[in-house]
Amino acid sequence: MTRVGVVTFPGTLDDRDAARAVEIAGAQAVSLWHKDADLHGVDAVVIPGGFSYGDYLRCGAIAATAPVMSEIVREAGRGLPVLGICNGFQVLCESHMLPGALIRNDHQKFLCRDQVLRIENADTAWTRAYSAGDTITVPLKNGEGNFQASPAELERLEGEGHVVFRYVDVNPNGSANDIAGVTNAAGNVVGLMPHPEHATEAGFGPLSLGPDGASHHGGTDGLGIFRSVLASLVG
């Protein structure tokens, strides 16, 4: 069975949710502690959301120096699929595995809402279950989700197809070019601010209208992200 590591730092909140999403997708979730200098032979890694090390200095800055991250950086350079969600995205940027930075939301408020995203790049290890142009609805919760990069970096990201997810209908945090997630050149490392792990199990996902016209919890739009990496590993 495919084994997917889920990293826990002090202050991580969503590791159990990420592990549950991995298991629903059909893989075995393997806990990786921040002090681990060994990835225990996992086939992919998820860095989940939360407030690692209390968000001191900058969000993700201390986590980027943890022993487990040295191994993740090394193995990602050899092709290991890595997904960073919310705080995990911040950690990937602080580790220079992905470009840009996540800063305070432009309205200076913490967000918690369902968010529509458009898949811009369906050719990464984490998005192959989708088609470019597909829209998905997943929860969003952050205070520092405002993605920014230099004009030259933004032009490169757009020109080389490295924008993976884009906010639809509304830009919730001021991110440049409505960017919600990006990838590296190889397509094995992806980071996004919204939380696909919270939209993987029927009855517990975002609100949607049912056949009776009433609102129901049940969206599973995020499950394809976890199924994508399994397909990438076996394909």
Regions found by a protein language model. Name each.
Residues 1-85, 93-99, 103-111, 118, ...:
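N-terminal beta1-alpha1 cap of cysteine-dependent amidohydrolase-like domains
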Residues 97-180:
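Pocket-forming structural segment of enzyme catalytic cores
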Residues 142, 179-212:
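A glycine-centered loop/beta-turn motif at secondary-structure junctions
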Residues 2, 133-135, 184-189:
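Beta-strand-turn-beta hairpins that frame and shape the catalytic cleft
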Residues 12-14, 52-54, 124-126, 144-148, ...:
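Short, acidic Gly/Pro/Ser/Thr-rich loop/turn segments
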Residues 88:
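Conserved Rossmann-fold NAD(P)-dependent oxidoreductase catalytic core, especially the SDR/UDP-sugar
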